[in-house]
């Protein structure tokens, strides 16, 4: 693994649009070195028999079967509204013109 330089840290900061003061370059250089060393360690792990996952816990979507049912007539629904205008519900204005 190649050593991380101050130039590398400045480049990463620039790509991330971070304003990194010069007095913090050494700190971030050391931290990036440790992070990349850890990633290199992870790359050594044999994962050939590990099933790929996207979550640590299995997520199951709870669904029900669709059932056809009678729906109210449009006119009945429109009559339930406090105000209507033709075939539309009338609602209070919330955006200024």
Curated annotation (Swiss-Prot):
Keywords tagged on the record: ATP-binding, Ligase, Nucleotide-binding, Protein biosynthesis
Top-level EC class as recorded in UniProt: ligase
Reactions performed catalytically: L-glutamyl-tRNA(Gln) + L-glutamine + ATP + H2O = L-glutaminyl-tRNA(Gln) + L-glutamate + ADP + phosphate + H(+); L-aspartyl-tRNA(Asn) + L-glutamine + ATP + H2O = L-asparaginyl-tRNA(Asn) + L-glutamate + ADP + phosphate + 2 H(+)
Pfam families in the cross-refs: GatC (PF02686)
EC number(s) recorded for this UniProt protein: 6.3.5.-
GO BP: any one term: glutaminyl-tRNAGln biosynthesis via transamidation
Assembly behavior: Heterotrimer of A, B and C subunits.
Described function: Allows the formation of correctly charged Asn-tRNA(Asn) or Gln-tRNA(Gln) through the transamidation of misacylated Asp-tRNA(Asn) or Glu-tRNA(Gln) in organisms which lack either or both of asparaginyl-tRNA or glutaminyl-tRNA synthetases. The reaction takes place in the presence of glutamine and ATP through an activated phospho-Asp-tRNA(Asn) or phospho-Glu-tRNA(Gln).
NCBIfam families with a match to the protein in the record: gatC
Entry similarity comment: Belongs to the GatC family.
Protein name (Swiss-Prot/TrEMBL): Aspartyl/glutamyl-tRNA(Asn/Gln) amidotransferase subunit C
Gene: gatC
